[in-house]
């Protein structure tokens, strides 16, 4: 058994210094755990901060927005409104579709929310229309979340209806089964159907009406149980030719007899194989296509989900005919991977820069290797904790590790520098390691816990911003904690074995030059410090000025929520006049697509028109524009958007709204622009008055561009005004009139064709091409009580009116959403203030409430908590420092350095044109933790000099400043160079990382210059105040040896 040497000291590091094998194995265990954790960690763009969101879609073809609202949306909303944990409920009722989006509290598991939604739908079933062709369908997906993958399916020799059928059964269903997939939508879906187009004059001439024909078709196509025959020895199942599965079979269907002669369906109608909804269309570039948009469930690993889909895609494509082409047009994971790879490169670059700084200061290869090992060990070990905490490798956690490179090396540098000082005095390396580590142990603990204290308030933040902060803060805190452990264990052990007097005194040309340079800097610093200490009030004035300037800059700097990212993907909405027809809208959509594809930065696009669960009105078209990689284009996304809008502005009668796709999606509805706020009222009439006024007012204000709203009440409505008395006299009911209209103009789904793999519909309508426009109403015939035909225009008049294209609700009340983008040079904070001002200027009534949505709402919450967050961080750090130093005064001296960091960070943000956003706030909070390190190192040594050497406070702080100048400069430069790659990043997602780097670099430069002078002056000021109030002896008793307290000893 090894005998422990009698060398005293070492503190908590003693055991590790004397047991090098155990220490090495302990570090190897941390390294292996980190490597295993890294390999198991998922990859994503950002921490998972999605609200549990479920979308409920109910289709009712032919129904007006009013009918959809009252008969479908309202009954469902009443049931959904009773669910616990519901945060927000938004609905959109348009012609033929009801879409309800349910957003739940962050704490509610998505599976629990799903169960509640299913129960609510079941409870509302009896209240829904009896002729509803499809039941409500819910999907665990946020409709505002852009698809993770977009596939375009085109064909040359096969009808698109047949292609759609194959894609739905062979591809879409299989992809929907992949873990993490929330919804697969088929835009432009030409789902096969048998279309029956009635010839109204022929129907009237034969004395028939559409209801008779509908009933005949429904009765002729059935698929029901028929039973079986069970004899003495055999059992026989009954079957029949009760189904008709093709247009040819329907043509010969006998629907009535006249004078003994059969009337077949083909006598009064055109029957064809067509699409279930012929008012849907999609294109890949300019070619007709079926577009598959694959959306993820909230909270899943997007990379793993996309990889699973891509792995199975080749096998799925093999099941399709060779003439069918499937292309992946959009893959959001490619930019996520590129962004993460860029951050990983910046992390390695930061490590290299930090090692370079260490070598320049230590001027010794052996001394450089020791902290160089501490950096990767601390970072890799963090991955193990991240795995057990359920984190992912994402931009924020990698940014935390990049910043940590400058933090984790600090502790090792302080330990090495202190041990080296004793070795250079001639002590043996082992004795120097024990003495130096024991002496510096309390400082390391102070630095670590005070820095972690800064991050504690971040853990208590709620909502989206809190989730974002939490993963960043915990990752950084773990890295710092592991760094402290490494610095108190591995670092002094390696110093004892690798450093020697000869190696430290050995010099080369670089070391001699740097030695002279640092001696010159310290000499000039000593002269400047003397002057500053002799003119304390001037220095205090400067310190106070930095505090005032920090407040002024905070008030002046533009404020935002999240940096605008260039992910190479743009979402677009094309808006046409509200009365536009489907064919006209499709033509305009293709015209715009052709213009966009000419732009040199555009690689491809998909576009879609029609009404379904993703698009509420016919006058809106959707676009998804894929840009070329950053390396292949000259401009960033804001410039490209401006250029595209200018190019399209020459197309008459349309307005194009564009917004870049972001990794962070908080909204629950797909909007035309980036930012939204909602107006709520008790009636639609109030909204119709005030929404246009507010939109018009905002359009005049400077911070806004692309101001619009989803309030559309100028759609053309053909109002059928029935003379009820005349209809009753003829034995015609309102139900019969509604049925006749629905049969003629509603693309009514009247029967179902069942096959082994799918179900198809029979669609009934009038052949409107024969009699276009309102004249088609003249062909409508009904059957009176005497069996004779009655023209609809004999009992009703047709009036053309204006009406809503869609009716929106927010939490069951009528609502309208106003959307806007920011004008060049304006911040989100300025826009929010301008909205509030506009409401006052137009004198918006009190019974109309406004509420910001999505990222704008999150911005308000973040802005409101920013100041309190910084105050909480300062208070937490004061408490920790007060406990460690057993003093009320010294923590104030240390915290006096903070305004210098704030000034530097805010100035840097303003000079580089960045806003004060969530990422910048993280940087400022981290600066609070970094900058106080300078003061801690000064004050620790000053207190020790006063206590152990009997120095005066003046001499003690003066010597502490000179003695700790090099480690202070070294640790500051290490942190600065650790942040430098983030500030200078240019790759994918650089917009997200730059504000953090700018804050860190700017704050460190300014604080480094100022705190070297302000801290000693403030130290002497508080020392003088303490002596004047309590007396000299009492003051000396209060300066307790903190390291003795830590070891359980009584103070001397």
Swiss-Prot record:
Protein topology in the membrane: Multi-pass membrane protein
Domain of life: Bacteria
Gene Ontology MF, one: xenobiotic transmembrane transporter activity
Keywords assigned: Cell inner membrane, Cell membrane, Membrane, Transmembrane, Transmembrane helix, Transport
Compartment annotation: Cell inner membrane
GO cellular component: plasma membrane
Pfam families reported for this sequence: ACR_tran
Region (Disordered), start-end ranges: 1032-1052
Protein family per UniProt: Belongs to the resistance-nodulation-cell division (RND) (TC 2.A.6) family. MdtB subfamily.
Oligomeric form and interacting partners: Part of a tripartite efflux system composed of MdtA, MdtB and MdtC. MdtB forms a heteromultimer with MdtC.
Protein name: Multidrug resistance protein MdtB
Origin species: Yersinia pseudotuberculosis serotype I (strain IP32953)
């Amino acid at each position: 058994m090894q005998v422990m040497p009698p060398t005293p000291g070492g503190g908590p590091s003693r055991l590790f210094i004397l047991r090098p094998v155990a220490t090495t194995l302990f570090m190897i265990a941390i390294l292996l755990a980190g490597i295993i954790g890294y390999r198991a960690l998922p990859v994503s763009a950002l921490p998972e901060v999605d609200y549990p969101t479920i979308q409920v879609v109910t289709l009712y073809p032919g129904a007006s927005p009013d009918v959809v609202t009252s008969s479908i949306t309202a009954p469902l909303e009443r049931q959904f409104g009773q669910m616990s944990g519901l945060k927000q409920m938004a609905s959109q009722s348009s012609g033929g579709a009801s879409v309800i989006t349910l957003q739940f509290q962050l704490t509610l598991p998505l599976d629990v929310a799903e169960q509640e939604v299913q129960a609510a739908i079941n409870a509302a079933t009896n209240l829904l229309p009896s002729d509803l062709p499809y039941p409500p369908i819910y999907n665990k997906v946020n409709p505002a979340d852009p698809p993770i993958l977009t596939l375009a399916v085109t064909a040359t020799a096969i009808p698109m209806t047949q292609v759609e059928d194959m894609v739905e059964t062979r591809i879409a269903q299989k992809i929907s089964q992949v873990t993490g997939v929330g919804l697969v939508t088929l835009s432009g879906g030409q789902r096969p159907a048998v279309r029956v187009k009635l010839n109204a004059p022929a129907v009237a001439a034969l004395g028939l009406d559409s209801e008779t024909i509908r009933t005949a078709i429904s009765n002729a196509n059935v698929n029901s149980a028929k039973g079986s025959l069970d004899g003495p020895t055999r059992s026989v199942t009954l079957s029949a030719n009760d189904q008709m599965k093709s247009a040819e079979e329907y043509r010969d269907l006998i629907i009535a007899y006249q004078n003994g002669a059969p009337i077949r369906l083909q006598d009064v109608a055109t029957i064809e194989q067509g699409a279930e909804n012929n008012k849907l269309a999609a294109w890949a570039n300019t070619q007709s296509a079926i577009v598959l948009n694959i959306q993820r469930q909230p909270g899943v690993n997007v990379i793993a989900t996309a990889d699973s889909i891509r792995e199975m895609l080749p096998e799925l494509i093999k099941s399709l005919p060779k003439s069918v082409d499937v292309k992946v047009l959009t893959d959001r994971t490619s930019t996520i991977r590129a962004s993460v790879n860029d951050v990983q490169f910046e992390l390695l670059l930061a490590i290299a820069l930090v090692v370079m700084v260490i070598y320049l200061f230590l001027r010794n290869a052996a001394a450089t290797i020791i902290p160089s090992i501490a950096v990767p060990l601390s970072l890799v070990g963090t991955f193990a904790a991240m795995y057990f905490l359920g984190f992912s490798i994402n931009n924020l956690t990698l940014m935390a590790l990049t910043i940590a490179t400058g933090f984790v090396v600090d502790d090792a540098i302080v330990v090495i520098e202190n041990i080296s000082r004793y070795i250079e005095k001639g002590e043996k390396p082992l004795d120097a390691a024990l003495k130096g580590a024991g002496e510096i142990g309390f400082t390391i603990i102070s630095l670590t816990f005070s820095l972690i204290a800064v991050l504690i308030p971040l853990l208590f933040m709620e909502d989206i911003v809190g989730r974002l902060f939490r993963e960043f803060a915990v990752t950084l805190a773990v890295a710092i904690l592991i760094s402290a452990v490494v610095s108190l264990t591995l670092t002094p052990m390696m110093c004892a074995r690798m450093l020697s007097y000869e190696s430290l005194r050995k010099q080369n040309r670089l070391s001699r030059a740097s030695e002279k340079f640092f001696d010159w800097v310290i000499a000039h610093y000593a002269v400047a410090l003397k002057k500053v200490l002799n003119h304390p009030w001037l220095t205090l004035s400067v310190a106070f000025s930095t505090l005032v300037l920090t407040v002024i800059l905070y008030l002046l700097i533009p404020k935002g929520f999240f940096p605008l990212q260039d992910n190479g993907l743009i979402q677009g909405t094309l808006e046409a006049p509200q009365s536009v027809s489907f064919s006209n809208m499709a033509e305009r959509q293709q015209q715009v697509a052709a213009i966009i594809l000419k732009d040199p930065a555009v690689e491809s696009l998909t576009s879609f028109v029609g009404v379904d669960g993703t698009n509420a009105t016919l006058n809106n078209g959707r676009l998804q524009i894929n840009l070329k990689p950053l390396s292949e284009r000259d401009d960033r996304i804001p410039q490209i958007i401006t250029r595209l809008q200018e190019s399209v502005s020459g197309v008459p009668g349309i307005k194009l709204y564009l917004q870049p796709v972001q990794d962070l999606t908080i909204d629950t509805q797909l909007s035309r622009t980036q930012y939204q706020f909602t107006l709520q009222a008790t009636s639609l009439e109030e909204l119709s008055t005030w929404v246009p006024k507010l939109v018009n007012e905002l359009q005049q204000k400077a911070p806004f561009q692309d101001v619009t709203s989803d309030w559309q009440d100028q759609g053309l409505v053909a109002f059928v005004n029935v003379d009820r008395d005349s209809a009753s006299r003829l034995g015609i009911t309102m139900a019969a009139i509604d049925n006749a209209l629905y049969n003629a103009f509603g693309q009514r789904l009247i029967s179902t064709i069942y096959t082994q793999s799918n179900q198809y519909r029979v669609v009934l309508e009038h052949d409107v091409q024969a009699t276009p426009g309102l004249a088609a109403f003249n062909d409508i015939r009904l059957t009176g009580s005497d069996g004779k035909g009655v023209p609809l225009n004999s009992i009703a008049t047709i009036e053309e009116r204006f009406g809503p294209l869609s009716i929106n609700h927010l939490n069951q009340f009528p609502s309208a959403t106003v959307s806007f983008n920011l004008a060049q040079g304006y911040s989100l904070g300025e826009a929010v203030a301008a909205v509030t001002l506009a409401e006052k200027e137009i004198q918006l009534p009190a019974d109309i409430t406004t509420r910001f949505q999505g990222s704008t709402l999150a911005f308000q919450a973040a802005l409101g908590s920013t100041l309190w967050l910084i105050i909480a961080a300062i208070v937490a750090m004061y408490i920790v420092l007060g406990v460690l130093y057993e003093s009320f005064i010294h923590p104030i001296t240390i915290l006096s350095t903070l305004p210098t960091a704030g000034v530097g960070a805010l100035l840097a943000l303003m000079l580089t044109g960045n806003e004060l956003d969530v990422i910048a706030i993280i940087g400022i909070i981290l600066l609070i933790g970094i900058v106080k390190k300078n003061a801690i190192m000064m004050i620790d040594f000053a207190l020790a000099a006063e206590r152990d050497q009997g120095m005066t406070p003046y001499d003690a702080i003066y010597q502490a400043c000179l003695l700790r100048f090099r480690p202070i400069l070294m640790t500051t430069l290490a942190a600065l160079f650790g942040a430098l790659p983030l500030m200078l990043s240019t790759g994918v997602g650089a917009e997200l990382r730059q504000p953090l780097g700018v804050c860190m670099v700017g704050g460190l430069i300014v604080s480094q210059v100022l705190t070297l002078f302000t801290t000693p002056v403030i130290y002497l000021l508080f020392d003088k105040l303490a002596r004047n109030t309590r007396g000299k002896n009492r003051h000396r008793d209060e300066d307790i040896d903190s390291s003795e307290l830590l070891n359980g000893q009584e103070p001397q």
